[in-house]
């Protein structure tokens, strides 16, 4: 990743778009597909890079910034549940300095003179849930989703052993929140069952828990060894407790499972001592944890601190460092992606790291192999932090044997044997044979049917491979005639290995359902290099309809300077992406495919919908010293109510809140005739909204 200190504004603008797109993709894979694409450490690095860029260039913060989002949007196969109180995720800290900064921010925000107790508890590596009780009866269970809308998993949550369906002495309305997980031993047994049944094994306990809870058939969930802890409250008709430690005691009294491992810390030293204790003893716990959660214990102080876009100010998660292991590198294989990029993959002597058997690891690119001097036959260090494919972090040179061999990048594509070329600026090797390369064609079809694209359920990796091998499909367009082809065939798909009448029927129904597709999904499904979900949405907002999109692409292909400049001015669409778009539309097969698809699909025009509130768009300015509020708390309250807080007064300002020694801003507000109030009036205004 680039050095943030040296990056200029233009580079930052492009990088923020790229990060938003990449993080959105990783969020969807983690929260919705339950199949993380990168390690926790790599994700955290990307997220923190995004935060640092936003801190340096606050005027470049995007509407779809990852720092404003929680989780990922829910799928259509479950009913949607709106969270009355948003289910936010936690910010992360990674060392003692970060923790001290977190504690200092609390003292500064609340203007505290002394340490306020912090409740510390293990961060369970599972799936977050919310359960609502009305008059003591469980009525709704939901996933976090995007933090505002989750999936209805009521039927599934009721199958969990000892999860209360009814609670006594409960308030009229109570929403509890917690984590659903699978213990390590149960996870091992579950994977053994999966293997015996010829099914794919789960990558880790978190994925197993999430996949189990998101089953359409609750009887499948009932067979899975799910457990839960509750640790927070979403909403309630009456106050249950005044602090986190009191709340857990109340939950236990009501019959919920709570994690008994928790500590009320009265100093920094006690916080760090508890963290070290859990880090050392995590291997002895029956379940996976990936850090320690710190919460301001006093609920009244929590309320004052409030939230930022995606997380509470009063809590954070102190993550454990990644788990390291060592094993032998047996060979290096090469994978060809949908855009022709070749990725080296390490094939390893199987090793258990953190309860998961690892036999493959990513090597990223060929420059990375050379930089780390990784050789076949070496003993390599692996880093795993909850990911599917861990990373190789280095080589144990002391164990290097004389016959360890260097790996030379291939000159020809392993799939189609065409000559490869090196792209220096991207540090990659690429096959440019496009759809004539079997590997690229396969990956392109896989991308086309994926959840974020056309979302055709029932066409997974194995099914796509099978249909291509049997000659039933050779490109995305063929998918929409699969039913007709099957009806005309003497050998029916439902009679072939791995298929059945029901699965084929469901597949055809899902294909039919996918024919109604939004324009951004369609653009993303095309698989244009560097055009991810966010950039597809940018293009959609610009063009509005499929017809206009195609017309503008034709002009772009003809090097129309006006359309080129228009697109180049869009945040995140730079010269490099425009070249990729032009290259894509220069390929005759791509144009034919798009034309054919447009004849069988209903590509919906773009419609922008935004929720409005009474304060949406109001611009307020705080100036001077407030008697009771810190500037941070005042700003947070305003933003929570939908206002935009500006640093200076202008003719666009709607309201100025003036404290002592207000100075030039107050003077300018008076000159412009802008409404001015003091802190007391502001607090009254806030209370009455």
UniProtKB/Swiss-Prot annotation:
NAD(+) binds at residues 40-44, 89-90, 121, 144, 179, 295, 319. Its EC number is 6.5.1.2. It comes from the Bacteria. InterPro entries: BRCT_dom, BRCT_dom_sf, DisA/LigA_HHH, DNA_ligase, DNA_ligase_AS, DNA_ligase_CS, DNAligase_adenylation, DNAligase_N. Its cofactor is Mg(2+); Mn(2+). Keywords: DNA damage, DNA repair, DNA replication, Ligase, Magnesium, Manganese, Metal-binding, NAD, Zinc. Zn(2+) binds at residues 413, 416, 431, 437. Gene3D superfamilies: 5' to 3' exonuclease, C-terminal subdomain, 6.20.10.30, BRCT domain, DNA ligase/mRNA capping enzyme, Helix hairpin bin, Nucleic acid-binding proteins. One of its GO terms (cellular component) is cytosol. It catalyses: NAD(+) + (deoxyribonucleotide)n-3'-hydroxyl + 5'-phospho-(deoxyribonucleotide)m = (deoxyribonucleotide)n+m + AMP + beta-nicotinamide D-nucleotide. GO terms for biological process: DNA repair; DNA replication. Residues 610-689 form the BRCT domain. The active site is at 123 (n6-amp-lysine intermediate). GO terms for molecular function: DNA ligase (NAD+) activity; metal ion binding. HAMAP family: DNA_ligase_A. DNA ligase that catalyzes the formation of phosphodiester linkages between 5'-phosphoryl and 3'-hydroxyl groups in double-stranded DNA using NAD as a coenzyme and as the energy source for the reaction. It is essential for DNA replication and repair of damaged DNA. Belongs to the NAD-dependent DNA ligase family. LigA subfamily. This is DNA ligase. The gene is ligA.
């Amino acid at each position: 990743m680039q050095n943030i200190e040296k990056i200029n504004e233009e580079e930052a603008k492009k990088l923020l778009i790229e990060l938003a797109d990449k993080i959105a993709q990783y969020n969807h894979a983690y929260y919705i597909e339950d199949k993380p694409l990168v390690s926790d450490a790599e994700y955290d690095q990307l997220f923190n890079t995004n935060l640092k860029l936003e801190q340096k260039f606050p005027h470049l913060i995007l509407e779809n910034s990852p720092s404003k989002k929680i989780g990922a949007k829910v799928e259509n196969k479950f009913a949607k549940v709106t969270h009355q109180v948003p289910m936010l995720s936690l910010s992360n800290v990674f060392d003692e300095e970060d923790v001290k900064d977190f504690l200092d921010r609390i003292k500064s925000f609340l203007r505290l003179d002394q340490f306020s107790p912090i409740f510390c508890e293990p961060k369970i590596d599972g799936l977050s849930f919310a359960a609502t009780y009305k008059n003591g009866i469980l009525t709704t269970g939901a996933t976090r989703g995007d933090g505002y809308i989750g999936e209805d998993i009521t039927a599934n949550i009721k199958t969990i052993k000892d999860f209360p369906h009814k609670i006594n002495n409960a308030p009229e309305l109570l929403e509890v929140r917690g984590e659903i997980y699978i213990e390590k031993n149960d996870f091992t047994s579950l994977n053994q069952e999966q293997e015996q049944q010829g099914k794919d094994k789960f990558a880790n306990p978190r994925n197993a828990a999430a996949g189990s809870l998101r089953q359409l058939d609750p009887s499948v969930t009932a067979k899975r060894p799910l457990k839960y802890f509750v640790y927070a409250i979403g909403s309630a008709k009456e106050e249950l407790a005044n602090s986190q430690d009191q709340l857990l005691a109340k939950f236990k009294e009501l019959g919920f499972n709570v994690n008994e491992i928790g500590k009320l810390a009265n100093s920094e030293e006690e916080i760090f001592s508890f963290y070290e204790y859990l880090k050392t003893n995590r291997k002895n716990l029956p379940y996976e944890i990936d850090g320690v959660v710190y919460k301001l214990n006093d609920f009244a102080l929590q309320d004052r601190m409030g939230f930022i876009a995606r997380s509470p100010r009063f809590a954070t998660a102190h993550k454990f460092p990644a788990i390291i292991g060592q094993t032998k590198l047996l060979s290096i294989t090469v994978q060809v992606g949908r855009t022709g990029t070749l990725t080296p993959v390490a094939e390893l002597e199987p090793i258990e790291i953190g309860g998961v058997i690892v036999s493959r690891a990513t090597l990223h690119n060929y420059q990375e192999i050379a930089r780390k001097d990784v050789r076949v036959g070496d003993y390599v260090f692996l880093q795993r932090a909850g990911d599917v494919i861990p990373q190789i972090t280095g080589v144990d040179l002391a164990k290097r044997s004389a016959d360890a061999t260097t790996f030379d990048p291939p000159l020809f594509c392993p799939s189609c044997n065409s000559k490869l070329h090196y792209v220096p600026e991207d540090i990659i090797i690429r096959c440019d044979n496009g759809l004539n390369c079997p590997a690229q064609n396969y990956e392109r079809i896989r991308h086309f049917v994926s959840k974020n694209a056309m979302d055709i359920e029932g066409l997974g990796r194995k099914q796509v491979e099978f249909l291509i091998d049997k000659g039933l499909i050779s490109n995305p367009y063929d998918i929409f005639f699969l039913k007709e082809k099957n009806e005309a065939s003497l050998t029916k798909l439902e009679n072939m290995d791995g298929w059945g009448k029901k699965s084929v029927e469901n597949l055809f129904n899902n294909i039919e359902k996918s024919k109604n597709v939004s324009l951004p999904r369609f653009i993303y499904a095309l698989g244009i290099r560097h055009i991810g979900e966010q950039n597809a949405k940018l293009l959609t907002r610009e063009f509005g309809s499929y017809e206009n999109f195609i017309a503008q692409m034709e002009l772009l292909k003809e090097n129309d300077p006006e359309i080129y400049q228009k697109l180049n001015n869009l945040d995140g669409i730079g010269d490099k992406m425009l070249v990729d778009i032009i290259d894509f539309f220069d390929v005759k097969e791509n144009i034919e495919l798009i034309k054919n698809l447009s004849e069988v699909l209903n590509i919906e025009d773009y419609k922008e919908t935004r929720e409005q509130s009474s304060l949406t768009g109001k611009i307020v300015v705080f100036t001077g010293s407030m008697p009771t509020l810190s500037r941070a708390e005042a700003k947070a309250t305003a933003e929570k109510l939908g206002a935009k807080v500006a640093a200076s007064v202008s003719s666009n300002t709607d309201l100025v809140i003036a404290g002592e020694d207000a100075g030039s801003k107050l003077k300018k507000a008076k000159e412009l005739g802008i409404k001015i109030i003091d802190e007391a009036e502001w607090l009254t205004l806030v209370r009455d909204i």
